[in-house]
């Protein structure tokens, strides 16, 4: 599902990040404590009254070296470009400032709904001071203390009320994929080459985000695809377009909307920290993954080049051991014909279901090879396992005590399941549950 976007804006020190964390709460989860698997705190998923939304802390995107008003303008511009709903945070302690008025004028000219959150209203006596904020012309101010959690519910109610109506999903048989990576890795060239290679009739479809143009196409076998454009990547003249955090945010939004993610690496430049960061987010989100090394034609190669690259990738991306690696050239079209079929194969892995009887045979065989562990004289007992969902495939293993299921044994079972059923290109999740 494509989530609507809520952006938090406001001058420094009004409590934007505190409000962000209060709304996001514990919903930001690190699935595995593995080096390179991180989630950027400027982007999270919020939920209230059974409605989910993407949450952006624009303050996290600031260039701290930029002039004060440039930072403010920068935030407001991102919010206007990206958000369905804008939460404008001001400080009840300091009252209306020139910077607040500056942002209010920018936001007033947009057609986006704006919620005026007066933060740092830490005691009832201060509520009388919020009426000054009506002068900003943005409607009713919502008093809040994000530190204490006061008023957050009212702000969330207002957010939900102003979110756009939920949109229907694309045809379930459509495979949604995106190409992500640092600037200048050749994403645009790859997109154009893929479309040309498939000789498809591609039609631009207005995306659910403001500036996204997705490309819907059908291959020669009748399989439908939706190629998700990382919105705004091609826009020019934006001061913030080349900042890494903004690029990360764009990539994260594309990942959220994708079934399969193609991580594009520049063969000339090698693997960078950005690549691992984005790959970690896609892994956590349970997306299918392909590691695409582009500009392969520009490297001088010998008989060991491919093996060296594969070894380095496996070392740098240890959490992506399931992801296939493909070396391509958008310029010469080398191996591009293999990409659509690989995307399709990984989508099938993401949607694969294993009958419980067959799954439990594999689990029992695994236990015979490597008996369950013991702790303080008590042995882990596995009663049965079942698959509970797809995208990614998720399995629940019912046991006598959850605490006895050591991470290493869970990983062993995952490897046995992968050996039996392949699951190429997709993470799989195993969850231990105590049998009731």
UniProtKB/Swiss-Prot annotation:
Among its keywords, does the record have 4Fe-4S?
no
Q: Which InterPro entries match?
A: G_ENGA (IPR031166), GTP-bd (IPR006073), GTPase_Der (IPR016484), KH_dom-like (IPR032859), KH_dom-like_a/b (IPR015946), P-loop_NTPase (IPR027417), Small_GTP-bd (IPR005225)
Described by its record, this protein's role is as follows: GTPase that plays an essential role in the late steps of ribosome biogenesis.
| Subunit structure of this chain's protein | Associates with the 50S ribosomal subunit.
Q: Which GO terms describe its molecular function?
A: GTP binding; ribosome binding
Q: Does the keyword Membrane apply?
A: no
Positions of the KH-like domain: 352-436
One BP term from GO: ribosome biogenesis
Instruction: Indicate what this protein is called per its UniProt record.
Output: GTPase Der
UniProt cross-references to Pfam families, sorted A to Z:
KH_dom-like, MMR_HSR1
**Which positions are annotated as binding GTP 2?**
181-188, 229-233, 294-297
**What is the superkingdom listed in this entry's lineage?**
Bacteria
Residues holding GTP 1:
10-17, 57-61, 119-122
| Source organism per UniProt | Streptococcus uberis (strain ATCC BAA-854 / 0140J)
CDD domains cross-referenced by the UniProt entry: EngA1, EngA2
Instruction: Return the similarity comment.
Output: Belongs to the TRAFAC class TrmE-Era-EngA-EngB-Septin-like GTPase superfamily. EngA (Der) GTPase family.
Q: Please name the gene that encodes this protein.
A: der
User: PROSITE patterns, per this entry?
Assistant: G_ENGA (PS51712)
The alphabetized UniProt keywords are:
GTP-binding, Nucleotide-binding, Repeat, Ribosome biogenesis
Q: Which PANTHER family match?
A: GTPASE DER
Location of the EngA-type G domain: 4-167, 175-351
